[in-house]
Amino acid sequence: MAKAVDESTYEQRVRALYDKQIRMEAREAGVIKKISKFNSNLLDLKEAVVRHHQKVGKVRKVKMLRCGELEKRANFMEELTQELEATKQRNLVMRDQIKQLNVLARQHRNEVMESIHTLSKTTGTYLNHEALPARVKGVTVLRNDNSDQLIPFDLKATDVEGLESLCQHLQGFNIDAFQWRQLVSLATEMSMDSHTTPTTPPKEAAEGKSIIEIDLTSPTSHI
């Protein structure tokens, strides 16, 4: 009887050990499964970290490129601003120079007009400024006690011989040929200036306005 009890107890112990081993194996299998899953998750995580680092690297590279572009753009804008400022300053200087040149031009024009007026009165010669610079056209008035004598002329500006002959003819009436040539030269200079307004011949020359040619064969015009 005692022997049967011992065998039954032994069998229970063996079965208990077997069941315990089965449970341990099942637990071990579960642990192994969890470890395998953990390792798989860890591997996925590592791969995700690697991909993340790659993306971060790309982002950093793009950021560096963009920063470089922004820096270049900022430098370009700064250079452009400096160039615009320099251009503005140059324009201001040029504007002042143009103003000064305009002032000098007006002064020169006024001086020339004053000289023309003086020479015109001195020589008694009044030019048709509309005919210049192609032609030298006008009239010289000889003042006399009884009546004024008009010597009209109309020559091409390139007619050197004709102009020289006219000067010699005028010298015969005590007209200063140098002053007469200077008058023609200054009047021609004024006519070539597009901003010059032709001067109006004085009232004394109105009578000779319709006479446009000199007759070198006439008694009063003979050299």
Curated annotation (Swiss-Prot):
GO terms for cellular component: Ndc80 complex; nucleus. Signal peptide: none annotated. The keyword Cell cycle applies. It is found in: Nucleus; Chromosome, Centromere, Kinetochore. Keywords: Cell cycle, Cell division, Centromere, Chromosome, Coiled coil, Kinetochore, Meiosis, Mitosis, Nucleus. Residues 65-115 form a coiled coil. GO terms for biological process: cell division; meiotic metaphase chromosome alignment; meiotic spindle organization; mitotic metaphase chromosome alignment. It comes from the Eukaryota. Acts as a component of the essential kinetochore-associated Ndc80 complex, which is required for chromosome segregation and spindle checkpoint activity during meiosis and mitosis. Required for kinetochore integrity and the organization of stable microtubule binding sites in the outer plate of the kinetochore. Participates in SAC signaling that responds specifically to disruptions in spindle microtubule dynamics. The NDC80 complex synergistically enhances the affinity of the SKA1 complex for microtubules and may allow the NDC80 complex to track depolymerizing microtubules. Component of the Ndc80 complex, which is composed of Ndc80, Nuf2 and Spc25. Belongs to the SPC25 family. This is Kinetochore protein Spc25.
